[in-house]
Amino acid sequence: MSPAILNINNSGICLFQNDKVLYREIGIILNSDQGLLVGSKAMDSRRILPKNINYDFWGDLSESKIRSSLFSDYSSADLVSYQLKEVQQFINNNDPIIIIYPSYLDSENLSLLLGIANALDIQIITFIESSIAATKEKYFASKIIHLDIHLHGITASLMTDKKDVSVEESIFIEECGLFQLYDNWIKLITESCIEQLRYDPMHSAKTDQLLYNKVSKIIDEVTKKNKVTINIDSEDVSKIIEINSSAFIDAVNKNYRHLVTKLRSLFSRNENYVIQLTQQIAELPGLITLLESSFSCFVR
């Protein structure tokens, strides 16, 4: 049997083996009256109890105590350990695993992660940087730029496509992570509700959370239709609004343009480039079109 693989991306910590997903949860923790809750259970309260939420622990991996009154008893390493305990329940027969990690984790972070895993009796075979793990074909281009999206930003890795793929440089681009995009889409939907229904779904944390829970499905519809219909849940009755799909692209245009500006630092003259996207970032509405027009290179 092939070893299990743990892909570390806080937008979805994923354990899979033989092409089967065994565990997938967002890297977010809620400190509640019932104790710590991980993943989707925490996301259900992100807009209701924002001060009780921590979603920085994978990106700020250290043993220092967290500077937050509700998490002051914990370090980010403690929270990583807590989520890894959940992951461990899905590892078959305590099989050794391969870790795929994002470029923002350095050697010190990986050493700490190895120590956390050892303390939990999780055996790690090796660590593989995510951009290298994702590159499975030859593009016959001199340079590859790999993009992946996380909760707070996008990682961009510049790689050479020679005999063996290697990473030359990696940057972390803030202001264009999933949470920033979601917040802008929520703002668009809210403004449309006020305009079409004279109703503000953000007037209470509960209705705001109900709307937030729908965003990913709404964006999936945006990529398939010219116009989307959205059911807005209020306290008394469901209401319906319609928004042109192009408006969702316009709502995050500033984020996309920021990404393009930062990516230009990785390009140089007299080189052939391919921009390689993970599935999650490839599904963002309008992004591929913008990348193709901005860089005049193959995007896949």
Where are these regions (language model features)?
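Gly/Thr-rich phosphate-binding beta-strand-loop-beta motif of the actin/hexokinase/Hsp70
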Residues: 1-32, 137-168, 221-227
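Structural motif
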Residues: 7-10, 100-104, 148-150, 277-282
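Conserved phosphate-binding loops in N-terminal lobes of ATP-dependent enzymes
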Residues: 11-100, 168, 222-226
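Active-site neighborhood for divalent-cation/phosphate handling
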Residues: 75-140
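Phosphate/pyrophosphate-binding loops at sites that engage ATP/ADP/AMP, CoA/4′-phosphopantetheine
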Residues: 84-97, 194-204, 256-275
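Glycine-rich phosphate-binding/hydrolytic loop that grips phosphoryl groups
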Residues: 130-142, 148, 178, 182-184, ...
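Phosphate-binding glycine-rich/basic clefts of nucleotide- and phosphate-handling proteins
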Residues: 160-245, 279
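Helical "lid/coupling" subdomains associated with nucleotide-phosphate turnover
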Residues: 221-300
